[in-house]
C-alpha cells in the first residue's frame, strides 16, 4: 500500500487527478442521451404485400406461403409469423439479438426478389419491407382535423406531405396514416343498367384503363426547333371520366355516366378515424430499432412548426399523444431520488463522526465517484435511463463505503492522539487490502451478468457496468483523495461536540456495549447461532420457490392501448358505431386526458385505440386501476369487446396481439387447430388468474360460397376466369387505372354501387357477355349459399397458428398465471398434433426462470473464487458468504410484505445484496485474521475484537447503503413501480442481515476456523 502514500504527500497531483475525473464526467453527462430503459430492441422486419379483393385464404396460399418459403432461408431468423386478411399479408421476421438489422434487410430484399416469380401477377405493387417492430407502442400520435376538408383530402396531405417529411427524421422507423385512405375516382356501377345496355363489367374496366394512359409520345424537330408532343391521354377527375364512351347501342353512344355513378372519393370508403369526439386522420409514429425515444421526439417536435406551415390554414395539425412526457417525469423522479440518497448518506457520516471536517471528506468523494461514472457511460454508448440512474442511486451507498472504511480507521487513530498525516499513512495501510477486497468482490458479483447473452444480458449490462465503474472510481478515490483530505482536514483535538451529538455518541456506545454482551452469549452458545444460520438458509430456499414471480414490474407509463374486436360478420357502418361508443365510454373516465382511434381497411371487424391518461399528480388511480374500472363498463356493450392494456417501456417479441401476454398454438393440421383452439380459449377464460382472454383465430366470418356448374359453363361459352373477373370487378374494389399527379399517384376504383353490394340478391343481377355476345346471368351456371370463412389466416414457421392473448388481473403474477395455464392445458388432454407454448414476454419469462437461479449461483461462485484468491483460503470465503441467507430472507419477506412479485428488478437487488452484506463479513474476517496472525490471538478472541472494532464502520456502511436505497423503496412518483422492487429488496435484505449477521458471522468463523485446521489436503498456510 506504499504506492497510495504518494497521493497523501502530493496533494496538488491528487486534486488535479480528481478534477480530471470530474471534468470528464461533466462532459460525458452533457453528451449522454436520455431513454426510459437500456436499449433492448429486437431486430424486426415486416414484409407487406397486397392484392385488393383477395380473400384471406387466397392471400395466405398465394402470397404468404411463397414469401415465407423464401424468407425462412435467411440466417438468424428466430421467429417468422404471418397474418393474411382481406387483400393484405404481413410477414413479421424476428431476428437474433446479434443480427445486424441493415444486413438482415438486404437479405430480406433478396428473398423478396427470389419469390417474385411465384406471386400473383395481379398485385398492384411489389412486396415491401419496413424495419420496425409492429408490437411497439407509438412514440407519438398526430392528428389532422378540418371543418372544410374531407377525410380523403386530409389523408392525402398526411400521406403525401407530412408522412414523407416525418419518415426522413432520424430515429423515425415508421409513420402509419389511418382514419381514411387516398383520394380516388370511384366508379360505382349499376348492374341493371349494364344489362339493359348489353355492356359487361370487363368492357367498362377495359375502356377506363385504355382512356387513361401515360406513355411518351416523342418529339418532332426541324433544322431550327424541336417540339415535344403532348396529348390529352390522361384523365384526372370524375368529371373527365363520366363522358367516356363505353359502347354503341343502335348507333347511340353508351357513356360511363349512363351505367355508373362516378365520383371523386377515396380508395377505400371503409375507414374511419377519431380524435376524442371529432373525425380525424391519424399519423401514428414508431421509432426505428436502436433509436432514442427522447431525441426522436424532440426532432419531431422541432419539425412541427414547419409542417404546419405547409398546410392550409383550415387544417389543424396537433400532437395528440407524446410518450416522452412520462419518460422525462420518471427520470426526473430518479434524479431526485439520487440527490436525496447522496444527502442521506452524508448525514449518516456526519451523525457517526460528529465532525463537519470529517463529513466533508465523503461529501466530496461520493459526488466525484458518481460524476466520473458519466464519462465511462458515454464511452460505452449508454444512456441516462431508469436503470442506469437507479444504479447510480444505489451506488451512493457503495461508493461511500470505501471512503467510510478509510475515514473511520484514520479517525480512530486521530482520536487516539496520532497526528493526522501519520494516521492517514497508517490507516490506509491497515484497511487498503480490506477496501480492495470489498470492491473487487462486489464487482465480481456482476461478472456473470456481463457474460450473459440474450435479453437478460442486454438488459443488465448497462446497470452492471455503470455500478461497477462507480465502484472502481470510488476505490481509487478512497485510496488517494480520501486519505489525503484526512491528513489535512482532521484535527487531533477536535472541539467539544454539541450535547445532542454527544448524546448520539453515547447511544452508539451503549448499543456497542450491548452488542458485545450479546455476542459473548452467542459465542458461548454457538450451536444456536449455527442453527439460526441453517434455518435462514432453508427459509431463503423456501421463499424463493414460493414467492410469485413476474418478468418486469407492471409500469404506469400514462398510456393505454385498446384493441376492439367485434362480431366477425359485422358491417363497417356498425363497426364505426362501436368505435364511437367505446371512445365515448373511455373519454368519460376522469383519469383519461385524450383518446384517438381508427377502424377499417383490411381488418373489417377490429379497431385500435390509443389513450393518454392525465399526469400521475392529477389522478388518484394507477393505470391498472383505470383499466379495471373501465373493464366493468366496456363489457356491457353487445357484439364487440374492447381490451385495454397499459403500455410498457419494454415488450418482448414482435407479435401484434390484443393483450400483454400470448400463448401460441401450432399445428400442421388446420382442422385440428380450429377444433382445439376454442376449447383451450374457453378453458383459459374460466381461469381466475387471467382476464381479457381472446384469440386471433377468426374463422366465423360470413361467406357466400358459389358453386359453378362447369358443364353449363362450357355449353354457354363461359370459363372460370371470366366469372372470377366478373366478381372481382363487381365486389373487389378493383384498382383499374392510375392517375399520375406531381406529388402522388391515385387510383381509379371500380365496383358495383353500394346499393347492390349490401344484399346477397345482388348476385342475381350479375351478367356475363359470352363469346357470342349474349348476356348470361350468373344464376344460369352457379349456385350460392351462406357459409363461414376466416377473416384472417395466421402462420408461424410455415405451420398453421393461432395466438391466445391474455392480461393479468390485479394481484396476480405471471408465474401464477403460467402455472394455471399449464394445469389447464394438461387437464384438457390436447393431442400431440396441436403444440402449445408461450410467446413474447411470457416466453422470455419462462426462459429466465431457470437462468435466474443459475445467475445467482454463478454470482456467488464468482465471489467465492475472487475471495479465495485474495485470502489464499478455501474456508474464509465461506465465512464471508454465510451472510447471504439472512439477506435473502429479508429481501424476499419484504417483497411478500409489500405484495411485490419477484421480477428482474428484484433479481438485481438480490445480486446487489450479495455484494453489500458480505462487506460486513469482510471487515470482520480481515481484522480477525490480522489479529490471529500478528498478535497470536485465538480465533474467538480475534473475531470478538474484530466485531467490536468494526462495529461502527459496519453500522455506518449498512446505514449508508440502506438510506441510499430508501428513496427508491418509498418513491411514489412517475416510474416508482419500476424502482420500488429494487429499493424494497435492498432495504429488507439489509435490515434482516444487519440483525443476524453481526452474530452469525462470528459463529460461522469459529466453525470454519476449526474446519480449516482438520483436513490434511488443505494448503500448509491454512493449517498454520
UniProtKB/Swiss-Prot annotation:
Provide a Gene Ontology MF annotation, just one: xenobiotic transmembrane transporter activity
Among the Pfam families in the record, one is ACR_tran
> What stretches pass through the bilayer?
15-35, 333-353, 360-380, 387-407, 431-451, 463-483, 528-548, 853-873, 897-917, 953-973, 984-1004
InterPro entries linked: AcrB_DN_DC_subdom, Acrflvin-R, Multidrug-R_MdtC
Q: What is its main location?
A: membrane
Q: How does it sit in the membrane?
A: Multi-pass membrane protein
Cite the entry's keywords alphabetically: Cell inner membrane, Cell membrane, Membrane, Transmembrane, Transmembrane helix, Transport
Annotated localization: Cell inner membrane
Query: GO CC annotations?
Result: plasma membrane
Task: List, alphabetically, the SUPFAM superfamilies matched.
Answer: Multidrug efflux transporter AcrB pore domain, PN1, PN2, PC1 and PC2 subdomains, Multidrug efflux transporter AcrB TolC docking domain, DN and DC subdomains, Multidrug efflux transporter AcrB transmembrane domain
The UniProt entry, under HAMAP family, shows: MdtC
Family stated for the protein in its record: Belongs to the resistance-nodulation-cell division (RND) (TC 2.A.6) family. MdtC subfamily.
Assembly behavior: Part of a tripartite efflux system composed of MdtA, MdtB and MdtC. MdtC forms a heteromultimer with MdtB.
Entry protein name: Multidrug resistance protein MdtC
Q: Origin organism of this chain?
A: Erwinia tasmaniensis (strain DSM 17950 / CFBP 7177 / CIP 109463 / NCPPB 4357 / Et1/99)
Amino acid at each position: 500500500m506504499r504506492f497510495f502514500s504518494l497521493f497523501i504527500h502530493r496533494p496538488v497531483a491528487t486534486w488535479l487527478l480528481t478534477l480530471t475525473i470530474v471534468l470528464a464526467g461533466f462532459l460525458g453527462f452533457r453528451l449522454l442521451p436520455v431513454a426510459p430503459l437500456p436499449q433492448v430492441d429486437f431486430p424486426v422486419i415486416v414484409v407487406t404485400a397486397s392484392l385488393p379483393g383477395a380473400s384471406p385464404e387466397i392471400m395466405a396460399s398465394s402470397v404468404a406461403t411463397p414469401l415465407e418459403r423464401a424468407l425462412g432461408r435467411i440466417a438468424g431468423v428466430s421467429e417468422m409469423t404471418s397474418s393474411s386478411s382481406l387483400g393484405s399479408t404481413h410477414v413479421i421476421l424476428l431476428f437474433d439479438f446479434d443480427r445486424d438489422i441493415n444486413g438482415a434487410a438486404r437479405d430480406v430484399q433478396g428473398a423478396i426478389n427470389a419469390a417474385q416469380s411465384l406471386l400473383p401477377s395481379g398485385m398492384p405493387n411489389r412486396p415491401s419491407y419496413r424495419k420496425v417492430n409492429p408490437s411497439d407502442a407509438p412514440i407519438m400520435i398526430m392528428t389532422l382535423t378540418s371543418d372544410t376538408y374531407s377525410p380523403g383530402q386530409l389523408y392525402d396531405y398526411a400521406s403525401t406531405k407530412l408522412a414523407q417529411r416525418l419518415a426522413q427524421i432520424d430515429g423515425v422507423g415508421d409513420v402509419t396514416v389511418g382514419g381514411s385512405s387516398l383520394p380516388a375516382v370511384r366508379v360505382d356501377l349499376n348492374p341493371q343498367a349494364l344489362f339493359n345496355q348489353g355492356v359487361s363489367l370487363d368492357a367498362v374496366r377495359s375502356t377506363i384503363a385504355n382512356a387513361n394512359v401515360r406513355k411518351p409520345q416523342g418529339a418532332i424537330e426541324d433544322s431550327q426547333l424541336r417540339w415535344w408532343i403532348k396529348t390529352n391521354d390522361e384523365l384526372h377527375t370524375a368529371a373527365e371520366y363520366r363522358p367516356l364512351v363505353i359502347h354503341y347501342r343502335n348507333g347511340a353512344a353508351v357513356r360511363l355516366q349512363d351505367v355508373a355513378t362516378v365520383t371523386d372519393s377515396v380508395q377505400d370508403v371503409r375507414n374511419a378515424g377519431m380524435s376524442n369526439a371529432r373525425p380525424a386522420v391519424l399519423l401514428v409514429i414508431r421509432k426505428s430499432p436502436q433509436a432514442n425515444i427522447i431525441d426522436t421526439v424532440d426532432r419531431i417536435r422541432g419539425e412541427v412548426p414547419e409542417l404546419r406551415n405547409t398546410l392550409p390554414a383550415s387544417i389543424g395539425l396537433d400532437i395528440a399523444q407524446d410518450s416522452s412526457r412520462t419518460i422525462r417525469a420518471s427520470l426526473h423522479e430518479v434524479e431526485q431520488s439520487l440527490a436525496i440518497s447522496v444527502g442521506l448518506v452524508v448525514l449518516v457520516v456526519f451523525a457517526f463522526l460528529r465532525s463537519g471536517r470529517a463529513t466533508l471528506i465523503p461529501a466530496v468523494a461520493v459526488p466525484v465517484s458518481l460524476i466520473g461514472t458519466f464519462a465511462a457511460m458515454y464511452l460505452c454508448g449508454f444512456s441516462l435511463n431508469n436503470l442506469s440512474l437507479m444504479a447510480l442511486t444505489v451506488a451512493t451507498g457503495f461508493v461511500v463505503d470505501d471512503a467510510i472504511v478509510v475515514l473511520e480507521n484514520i479517525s480512530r487513530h486521530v482520536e487516539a492522539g496520532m497526528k493526522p498525516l501519520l494516521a492517514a499513512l497508517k490507516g490506509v495501510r491497515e484497511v487498503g487490502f480490506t477496501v480492495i477486497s470489498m470492491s473487487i468482490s462486489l464487482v465480481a458479483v456482476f461478472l456473470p451478468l456481463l457474460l450473459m447473452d440474450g435479453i437478460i444480458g442486454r438488459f443488465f449490462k448497462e446497470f452492471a457496468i455503470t455500478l461497477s465503474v462507480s465502484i472502481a472510481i470510488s476505490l481509487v478515490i478512497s485510496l488517494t483523495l480520501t486519505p489525503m483530505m484526512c491528513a489535512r482536514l482532521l484535527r487531533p483535538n477536535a472541539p467539544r461536540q454539541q450535547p445532542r451529538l454527544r448524546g448520539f455518541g453515547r447511544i452508539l456506545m451503549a448499543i456497542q456495549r450491548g452488542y458485545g454482551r450479546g455476542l459473548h452469549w452467542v459465542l458461548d452458545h454457538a450451536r444456536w447461532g449455527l442453527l439460526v444460520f441453517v434455518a435462514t438458509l432453508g427459509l431463503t430456499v423456501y421463499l424463493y420457490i414460493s414467492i410469485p414471480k413476474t418478468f418486469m414490474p407492471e409500469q404506469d407509463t400514462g398510456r393505454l392501448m385498446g384493441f376492439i374486436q367485434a362480431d366477425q360478420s359485422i358491417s363497417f357502418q356498425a363497426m364505426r358505431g362501436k368505435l364511437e361508443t367505446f371512445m365515448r365510454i373511455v373519454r368519460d373516465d376522469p383519469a383519461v386526458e385524450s383518446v384517438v382511434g381508427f377502424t377499417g381497411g383490411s381488418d373489417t371487424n377490429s379497431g385500435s385505440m390509443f389513450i393518454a391518461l392525465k399526469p400521475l399528480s392529477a389522478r388518484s388511480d394507477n393505470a391498472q386501476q383505470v383499466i379495471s374500472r373501465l373493464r366493468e363498463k366496456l363489457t356491457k356493450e353487445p357484439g364487440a369487446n374492447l381490451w385495454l392494456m397499459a403500455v410498457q417501456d419494454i415488450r418482448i417479441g414482435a407479435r401484434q396481439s390484443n393483450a400483454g401476454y400470448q400463448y401460441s398454438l401450432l399445428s400442421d393440421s388446420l382442422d385440428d387447430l380450429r377444433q382445439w383452439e376454442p376449447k383451450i380459449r374457453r378453458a383459459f377464460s374460466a381461469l381466475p388468474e387471467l382476464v381479457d382472454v381472446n384469440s386471433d383465430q377468426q374463422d366465423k366470418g360470413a361467406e357466400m360460397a358459389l358453386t359453378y356448374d362447369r358443364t353449363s359453363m362450357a355449353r354457354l361459352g363461359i370459363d372460370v376466369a371470366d366469372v372470377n373477373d366478373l366478381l372481382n370487378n363487381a365486389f373487389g374494389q378493383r384498382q383499374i387505372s392510375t392517375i399520375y399527379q406531381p406529388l402522388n399517384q391515385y387510383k381509379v376504383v371500380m365496383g358495383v354501387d353500394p346499393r347492390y353490394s349490401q344484399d346477397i340478391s345482388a348476385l342475381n343481377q350479375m351478367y356475363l357477355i359470352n363469346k357470342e355476345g349474349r348476356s348470361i346471368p350468373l344464376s344460369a351456371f352457379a349456385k350460392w349459399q351462406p357459409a363461414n370463412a376466416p377473416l384472417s389466416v395466421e402462420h408461424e414457421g410455415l405451420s398453421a397458428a393461432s395466438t391466445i392473448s391474455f392480461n393479468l388481473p390485479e394481484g396476480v403474477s405471471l408465474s401464477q398465471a403460467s402455472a394455471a395455464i399449464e394445469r389447464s392445458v394438461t387437464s384438457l388432454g390436447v393431442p400431440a398434433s396441436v403444440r402449445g407454448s408461450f410467446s413474447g414476454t411470457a416466453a422470455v419469462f419462462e426462459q429466465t426462470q431457470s437462468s435466474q437461479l443459475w445467475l445467482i449461483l454463478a454470482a456467488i461462485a464468482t465471489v467465492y473464487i475472487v475471495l479465495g484468491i485474495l485470502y489464499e483460503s478455501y474456508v474464509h470465503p465461506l465465512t464471508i458468504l454465510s451472510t447471504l441467507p439472512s439477506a435473502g430472507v429479508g429481501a424476499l419477506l419484504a417483497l411478500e410484505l409489500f405484495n411485490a412479485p419477484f421480477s428482474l428488478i428484484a433479481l438485481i437487488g438480490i445480486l446487489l445484496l450479495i455484494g453489500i452484506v458480505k462487506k460486513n463479513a469482510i471487515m470482520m474476517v480481515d481484522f480477525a485474521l490480522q489479529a490471529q496472525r500478528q498478535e497470536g490471538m485465538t480465533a474467538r478472541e480475534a473475531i470478538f475484537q474484530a466485531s467490536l472494532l468494526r462495529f461502527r464502520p459496519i453500522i455506518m456502511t449498512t446505514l449508508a447503503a440502506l438510506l441510499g436505497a430508501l428513496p427508491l423503496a418509498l418513491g411514489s412518483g412517475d416510474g416508482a413501480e419500476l424502482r420500488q422492487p429494487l429499493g424494497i429488496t435492498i432495504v429488507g435484505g439489509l435490515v434482516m442481515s444487519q440483525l443476524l449477521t453481526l452474530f452469525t458471522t462470528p459463529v460461522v468463523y469459529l466453525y470454519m476456523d476449526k474446519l480449516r485446521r482438520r483436513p490434511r489436503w488443505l494448503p500448509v498456510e491454512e493449517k498454520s
